[in-house]
């Protein structure tokens, strides 16, 4: 039900009962006696007696004046909605429309008015279903009318086509329900005679229907006295300002006629047409839609009852914010122009170029935030507004502005026109399809042009929106007939490339916030409205992209106001892009919730003093201080109530949550010991093998094909490099052919049976160092190198079984960053040293001034003569065979040393700078990544072509046999006899091989388990799990068996494994500009590793091509691996700090939290351990360097903990490396791991 306070013409006298009109003889009305009793009962005297009796029982303080506190209580509670008189009567007194009974006379319809009576004009219609439900709920408590025929009860209601009637019922004292409160205007007019401004009132007709006849607080009596009416009392929440129940200010006539009449005449017309005097049969006037925005749905005007208006779900979503400013276009016509947007960070439109600038953190002025808070405190706030189109929202916003006294009634049309102006975006000029921005006026003309219909088929605005005509008729009802989601007929537009690209960056299920700010001169002061729609809807031609809109913010005002509208718009946009604030905006129930959220935002904001900043280094403290504020904000967020936050409050809930988290963590920890033999291995099998079939199904993705090509070259290049160097170290007993076959066979088996198929197994630098040391040991003791490797492989299998049975993989947790960095730094130094050692050796064999010196050779004199004669005319055929196995290497060749230096340096610099190019700013990202990922093969190919083009200079080539053959067929075969090839192998060495087996096992264990730890980090979001015990057993066992065939041992290659995982990682496309990419999923499958292993094995057939690779090129790759391995090693960075003054130290944790001398002491201890390892490597005991390396683990756990505090150790020895997926300059996979290549 809806009603409104009436303005009496003459104060309290207007409530006097007029003389009853005589009814015609044919009128089927009440008898005259009953009619007289009705008039006497409904007269003002009887009405005032009821109020006085109720007021005396209410205990209200006489002569009380109402102040701001009463208003605040009145507005913040549910009582601030004005109710008609009928809602203050007890439930049994408010009779609803009921079906005609046999003893009840039929009611009169408007068309059947008596002769001589003026017919009524329809006003509204009440909901039949709600009336029947309310009648059914009150039926048991209502006494029968027949039981008390002498008493009369009155009721008020509005029905379309029905008059207000009074029937005889049982007496009931008029009382208020406990949750109701007498509206101040209910008695003010009768008691004081003060005119009351006419307002639009929304009343709940079923507010107390569920309580039946419950007794409550009686009506209060208002003593005579004047009280000014406050317009603030007419405020209401947005859910009660919907189009179904919005009753707008009643205008007695059209505006053109009202301008010619005096105020007294208008008041008289209002009194005559709108007053509702009790006991008098009067006309009901239908509202005139002219000059106001009338909205209705099926003619109903139901009140906002809880049953008919359920609360909308307020689940927070991701947001997209767009700032539109009211500016003039090139034709000097006003329009809404997009000037900024927020996905996570702010992006501004550059005025000169009309293109988007770089994303940045929004910097706001403190004054604009205070102005925003002030406008929100006094402006219009509409929450849960039920509208589907922009015109519908605009009508409700404008009317709420009038109600809240922000704008004058005559400014309604101008504000409405401003809200419905055209929207333009920077991308509009780039689209060559159908224009996307269609205003309401142009849309009407467009539809009329396409369909050939008259004015009746035009849409909702019949007058131009941009103009000075004050009379605008808006028909929202016709607008509602068109589904909001259906596009206009004949208008279809495909999304442009710009829209598709922007939609990829916006999170899924995001909802938009539209901010409209501008300067208009027709307003005398600023006006503001904050709107939250009940459901997110797509508003046509408003946003740059089709995203449903949930929030709108409007701020209009004159230029004379001391207010920066642009900065306030940026402030509310930044607030809405803030996660905590927009969640609070979703959950807000009233204005105070928004103001509280602004205060919380201000509490965590940073204010910079107005001083000049000379350099960016001066702002470092700002970032640090902001991180502290954000940490404090997160801690406060954990203390939210259970209804709002996820943190349990009671001690029992916290203890239970901790137990559940601990149990889940223990269950997911693959290194947790079970206490049973092979318990970890069994858990690995049970965890990983159920996903075996999905490991092949998940490979059906185009990204896996690209990963196969990339990882193939990433695996082949080290195989060729290490194979060539290993052949140099072992005199071709193990070379390129053996390493390629070992990589292929072990790779296939591991990809089929392994627990973590993302691992790429291959040869590494530490194994190369051990192979060289063991070959030197066997050569010096006259032992067969390959036979000794067979017995080492036998002990390796036994050691692996023992370690897996005892679940010893957990020991990898004790290998801290202290040991890893020493290990990685040692291998990098060995790589760099070996490169220059080989280069110096080439210069010694081929000196620069050796042209006048007679050539010499390692072969006999005949071969010497051959090389001397061909030294200057070495053709391609001879050059390609110059490095064949079994042939001697010439000495003293001219230009060989210089060419080798050029090839080595060129390979290194090409590979190094292509790696840097990957994260540079040139070319699109996809092209850069392809070039950077294939940097090593590109460098090898370029330098091979350079060497091939220089035909008259000798260079040593890679020794690769033709076909499926070992590197040196004259020295060994494919099967190695464990008892000895040329002589019996000593028995004591069979047993003593246990010692070198332990050393090899240490190297394989460290590399494999640390690599698995890096791959299995939580940040990578792997779903199928890993298997430390199963992978270790497979790799070591395969290495032991391969030793029988003279193949090298392999381990999990750290860099190649991380590169493989990164290639199979799918990053989310919905990444806000300026934000870090997030992992969407990882293609955990076995097919890519399997195909890579097969392709590496098939590479043996390209022996002719591999034989064209000079060894100097491999030395360049060796140098490249040594230098790049130093990246990300904190030990290497702290060595630089030894030579820097403290003021130039970087802003990192181990610098800020640890004193400089203590930090240098830790670096010195690491340097001492590194020197000890290098000394061991330089002696005959080089075979034992893994044992010295493993001693650094107890050194760190026992000795360093006594020298440094726990806090210092956490800063100096913490593993802070995170997976790297974004394109930061100078950062890639090498920065993630302190492990050797």
Swiss-Prot record:
Q: How does it sit in the membrane?
A: Multi-pass membrane protein
Which segments does the topology annotation call Extracellular?
Answer: 844-896
Mark out the compositionally biased spans (Basic and acidic residues): 37-49, 58-75
**Compositionally biased intervals (Acidic residues):** 122-133
**Phosphoserine PTM sites in chain numbering:** 113, 144, 170, 172, 239, 439
Provide the positions where the record notes the PTM N6-methyllysine: 270
Listed under GO cellular component are: apical plasma membrane; basolateral plasma membrane
* Subcellular location(s) per record: Cell membrane; Apical cell membrane; Basolateral cell membrane
What Pfam families does the record tag this protein with?
A: Band_3_cyto, HCO3_cotransp
Record's signal peptide: none
* Compositionally biased region (Gly residues): 206-215
| Membrane spanning residue stretches | 704-727, 733-770, 790-812, 822-843, 897-914, 930-950, 984-1006, 1032-1053, 1087-1132, 1159-1195
Provide a Gene Ontology MF annotation, just one. chloride:bicarbonate antiporter activity
Q: Which parts of the sequence are annotated with region: Disordered?
A: 1-237, 281-316, 445-464
**Glycosylation-annotated residues:** 855, 864, 878
Instruction: Kindly state the tissue distribution recorded for this protein.
Output: Expressed in the ileum (at protein level).
* Compositional bias ranges of the Low complexity kind: 137-151
User: Where does this protein have compositionally biased stretches of type Basic residues?
Assistant: 76-85, 94-110
Positions in the Cytoplasmic compartment = 1-703, 915-929
Annotated region (Membrane (anion exchange)) at: 704-1237
Kindly list the positions at which Phosphothreonine occurs in this protein. 253
Q: What does this protein do?
A: Sodium-independent anion exchanger which mediates the electroneutral exchange of chloride for bicarbonate ions across the cell membrane. Plays an important role in osteoclast differentiation and function. Regulates bone resorption and calpain-dependent actin cytoskeleton organization in osteoclasts via anion exchange-dependent control of pH. Essential for intracellular pH regulation in CD8(+) T-cells upon CD3 stimulation, modulating CD8(+) T-cell response.
Instruction: Give the UniProt family note.
Output: Belongs to the anion exchanger (TC 2.A.31) family.
The protein depicted here goes by the name Anion exchange protein 2
What organism is this sequence from? Oryctolagus cuniculus
